[in-house]
């Protein structure tokens, strides 16, 4: 928290503090307003309209940020959700499918969150353009999935990409290659907000530019921005006019987030006749998911609670797998008409996530964000569906990439499914060390992807390379100490083995 805010909180504990605080906050808001007006004067006529919308949106978020004090949830009010508010997927699936699947599919729009860069995996440009399977990128697989649906059922399900200013240009260049696919592709941009100095709480940006020295002055404000940006883009009204009724929103790097016909049918033909405006797919927590947001009952409504909102004294309780058994997959099904209604009433309420960052020059900043799932409490008749783990297959690291590139999964029409040859439906735990962090380095260290059908756990640390046709089974731990190197020879079978020390294989 900034020194400014700390000074404020001290002042609050004194007499007349609230009045003093109010004056300070008003002064600060006025200063920010002036700074934003200065920034807007640097916009060209072409940039002016969308920059003004962005800065107006930022001002609203900033105003709320200044008003908030302490954790945004009262721990005493958090309850487990009622039984009927989170339905098991098996129950949804048991209802079967309608005779005319195309009639429900034609009411759907698929939206993929495509604002992220591949920097965490050492790649420049949009993450969605990283090759994940047989040289297919995340975007290729998404297009293949939807094209398969449209061809199979003679439907017209469009794909919409929510880009950020970081990914828009590169994504649009690549979209030409899908011109002959049977998928209409649309894009819109999420907002661009200025980062603020952690001490002064004023914007770092001096002009609208986000290149050169100003590259780090701006950020995309989280996927909660989808509601306003989708509405402002005009696409929301376009789809409503075309008779579309629901959007299926998911992260483009979640390879398990395919269109599920059973969930869609449940939305379009609810058993009690009352339609859900918002469905969140949740899945059971494992020890690896303790930080994931969870669905709770709060003041009579379903509410997503993230770890950042939890008071420090209750963090361990929040992480407990026994008390909070599920977490949010960020696969969401949302009524288009409801988004329009709530957006026009300014009634979409999402908690602010304060994300601290340090810029390359060492300046400490904060960026204010919101999360798309946090809006669940603003919608009527919301529902959680507890889906199989297979619908949550995110690729955040090269460890995840190794899993999806391996023979653990088979690829069919853009969809990955667990191989029938694997005896257990669980996914192995894979931890690759820092030598594998960048995709380029990772690919160089595997002559071919090992056979992992019988693998339970793999840990690799240090300078390690794998030859062709290696097979890994059970628990395998490979550790090359600093200065050492281990080459796993071609055709090696490692089952329940620890490999350490130094092993070099050189061409004769």
From Swiss-Prot:
It is found in: Cytoplasm. Substrate binds at residues 115-116, 223, 251-253. The keyword Nucleotidyltransferase applies. The modification Phosphothreonine is found at residue 426. It catalyses: alpha-D-glucose 1-phosphate + UTP + H(+) = UDP-alpha-D-glucose + diphosphate. Residues 502-503 are annotated as: Critical for end-to-end subunit interaction. Residues 457-508 are annotated as: Oligomerization. Pfam families: UDPGP. GO terms for biological process: brain development; glycogen biosynthetic process; UDP-alpha-D-glucose metabolic process; UDP-glucuronate biosynthetic process. UTP binds at residues 113-116, 127, 190, 222, 253, 396. The keyword RNA-binding does not apply. Homooctamer. This is UTP--glucose-1-phosphate uridylyltransferase.
């Amino acid at each position: 928290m900034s020194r400014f805010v700390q000074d404020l909180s001290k002042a609050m504990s004194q007499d007349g503090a609230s009045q003093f605080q109010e004056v300070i906050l008003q002064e600060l808001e006025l200063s920010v307003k002036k700074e934003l007006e200065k920034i807007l004067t640097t916009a060209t006529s072409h940039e002016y309209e969308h920059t003004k919308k962005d800065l107006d949106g930022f001002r609203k978020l900033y105003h709320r940020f200044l008003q908030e004090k302490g954790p945004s949830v009262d721990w005493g009010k958090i309850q487990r959700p009622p039984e009927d508010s989170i339905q098991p997927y098996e129950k949804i699936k048991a209802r079967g499918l309608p005779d005319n699947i195309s009639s429900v599919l034609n009411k759907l729009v698929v939206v993929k969150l495509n604002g992220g860069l591949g920097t965490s995996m050492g790649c420049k440009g949009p993450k969605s353009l990283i090759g994940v399977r047989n040289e297919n990128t995340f975007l290729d697989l998404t297009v293949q999935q939807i094209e398969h649906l449209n061809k199979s059922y003679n439907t017209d399900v469009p794909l919409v990409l929510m880009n950020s200013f970081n990914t828009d240009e590169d994504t649009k260049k690549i979209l030409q290659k899908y011109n002959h696919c049977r998928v209409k592709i649309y894009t819109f941009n999420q907002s661009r907000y200025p980062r603020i100095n952690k001490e002064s709480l004023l914007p770092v940006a001096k002009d609208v530019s986000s290149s050169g020295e100003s590259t780090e002055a701006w950020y995309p404000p989280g996927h909660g921005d989808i509601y306003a940006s989708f509405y402002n883009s005009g696409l929301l009204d376009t789809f409503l006019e075309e008779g579309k009724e629901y959007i299926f929103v998911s992260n483009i790097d979640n390879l398990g987030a395919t269109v599920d016909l059973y969930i869609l049918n449940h939305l379009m033909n609810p058993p009690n006749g009352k339609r859900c405006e918002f469905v969140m797919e949740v899945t059971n927590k494992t020890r690896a998911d303790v930080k994931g947001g969870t669905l709770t009952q709060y003041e009579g409504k379903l509410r997503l609670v993230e770890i950042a909102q939890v008071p420090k004294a209750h963090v361990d309780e929040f992480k407990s797998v026994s008390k909070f058994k599920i977490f949010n997959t960020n696969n969401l099904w949302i009524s288009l008409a409801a988004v329009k209604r709530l957006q026009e009433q300014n009634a979409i309420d999402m908690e602010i996530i304060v994300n601290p960052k340090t810029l390359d020059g060492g300046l400490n900043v904060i960026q204010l964000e919101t999360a798309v799932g946090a809006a669940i409490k603003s919608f009527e008749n919301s529902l959680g569906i507890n889906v199989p783990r297979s619908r949550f297959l995110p690729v955040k690291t090269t460890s995840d990439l190794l899993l999806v590139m391996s023979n653990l999964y088979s690829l069919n029409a853009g969809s990955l499914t667990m191989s029938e040859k694997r005896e257990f439906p669980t996914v192995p735990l894979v931890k690759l060390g820092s030598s594998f962090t960048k995709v380029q380095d990772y690919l160089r260290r595997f002559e071919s992807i090992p056979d992992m059908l019988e693998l339970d756990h793999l840990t690799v640390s240090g300078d390690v390379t794998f030859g062709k046709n290696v097979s890994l089974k059970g628990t395998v731990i490979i550790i090359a100490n600093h200065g050492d190197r281990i080459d796993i020879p071609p055709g090696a079978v490692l089952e329940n083995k620890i490999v350490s020390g130094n092993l070099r294989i050189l061409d004769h």
